[in-house]
């Protein structure tokens, strides 16, 4: 389950992103937090029509993971820090000492899996949150659901809690399915739904695809 197609694998796109414009004065901030590439993409849409906000590209950015950092760098943002473990709870502990005495802007989704905002608040970090995108469930007709339903013995990769929620909204998780999750929060959510999943040491899609291939080879 992912938000973009990945050849040659079958991708179930059950969510769609809605980007919201950023409307604020950027001058008070001297640090940015990004925990998702989608926050970057949303901000880029805003920058097309808001030249005054382009100074945000010169403000040091703290990125949760390498993919998010690369997206920032590819669009000429100034990356100051990349999370080592790429998990929300570990990431916030990594950046708290770096954000003391800074004025921080956290660009986020409407719903977030981690309690990053709460932890920053508890540690007295001066920050403002801006919701710049939302991950919404796509509407699927019954015929579309039947066409998309994974075959028995499929290996399913869940790249986010929102994708796991969307899958379980439309489909039953069969006993002979195998689940792989990116990140601890996604694995925990699946576990809460009674689904055990494999996790990789490195929370990346590439690592999950490699694990899926190795599991498929073992079955043969």
Where are these predicted regions, by residue range?
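Signature of uroporphyrinogen-III synthase
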Residues: 1-220
